[in-house]
Amino acid sequence: MIITTTNGIEGKRVVEYKGIVCGEVISGVDFIKDFAAGLTNFFGGRSKSYEGELIEAREGAIREMKERAIQMGANAIIGVDIDYEVLGQGGNMLMVTASGTAVVIE
């Protein structure tokens, strides 16, 4: 399956629009990661624990979106957008949403 942020796929023709498709992942951030990230921020550099959490959440949202597109009979997703949102009273949850248009291409 082709998944792209563009509104079309070069050399391919959209023959059917199946509809909007989304995937969502909500992930909690724990105390140890917060502490490690705080040390990283204090000493400078990148927080590998948070980066790993972001990558895992993004890949999960894309995977879920892809599975839903397959269920709709699509073989591609165009116009993909990925959004990140911090949730919870203490900002201790991360929501990643991937959305796009499920299509059939040839």
Curated annotation (Swiss-Prot):
Origin: domain of life: Bacteria
Cited Pfam families: YbjQ_1
Similarity remark: Belongs to the UPF0145 family.
UniProt xrefs under HAMAP family: UPF0145 (MF_00338)
The protein's name in its UniProt record: UPF0145 protein Cthe_0398
Lineage: Bacteria, Bacillati, Bacillota, Clostridia, Eubacteriales
